[in-house]
């Protein structure tokens, strides 16, 4: 196979269901055209719909797979993977397609009380990256030569080295840090949109 550049950024966000007893997910399309605040609002809206049962393809897929006898699940999964990933067809009734899992997956395990975690890439998903948020905790850190208490939020990432390497992961970490240190940047439109505005 070969690496094909995506036309858009689709962020998949893991969502707690039924008080944390189950996990589902919501997808945010064209995330590269939104500010962080717009993305957050979309996540809230889609998560509320998923929890109410109005928009939850993930849970429907899990329910469908659960009905298949265990010995045959792997065969069914491999068949779906071949149809969607290798042949490029969509199975709309199940919400499956070559881009079913989006461009990047975000999961907040801190909501389950876990300080830190590391995700494994799911081969059938074609996900190049998974970012895990841990639990925000007070930690002792050094600032201006003094030990002080600060709130620390652990972030870990798992990346597909066929698509990206340590340099790209480092650039992602650099920009996350930059945006967190300069929160006013979160309200800015992406550079691509600014350029389009200037040209128009």
Which residues does each PLM region occupy?
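C-terminal catalytic/motor cores of large multi-domain enzyme assemblies
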Residues: 1-200
């Amino acid at each position: 196979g070969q690496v094909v550049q995506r036309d858009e950024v689709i962020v998949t966000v893991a969502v707690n269901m039924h008080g944390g007893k189950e996990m589902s997910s919501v997808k945010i399309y064209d995330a590269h055209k939104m500010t962080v605040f717009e993305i957050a609002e979309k996540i809230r809206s889609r998560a509320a719909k998923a929890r109410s049962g109005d928009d939850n393809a993930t849970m429907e897929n899990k329910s469908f797979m659960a009905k298949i006898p265990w010995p045959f699940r792997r065969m069914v999964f491999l068949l779906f993977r071949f149809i969607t990933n290798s042949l490029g067809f969509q199975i709309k009734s199940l919400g499956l397609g070559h881009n079913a899992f989006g461009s990047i997956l975000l999961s907040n395990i801190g909501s389950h009380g876990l300080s830190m975690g590391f995700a494994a890439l799911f081969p059938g998903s074609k996900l190049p990256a998974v970012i895990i948020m841990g639990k925000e905790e007070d930690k002792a850190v050094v600032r201006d030569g003094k030990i002080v208490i600060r709130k620390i939020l652990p972030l870990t990432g798992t990346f597909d080295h066929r698509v990206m390497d340590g340099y790209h992961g480092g650039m992602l970490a650099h920009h996350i840090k930059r945006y967190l240190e300069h929160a006013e940047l979160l309200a800015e439109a992406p550079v691509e949109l600014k350029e389009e505005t200037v040209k128009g």
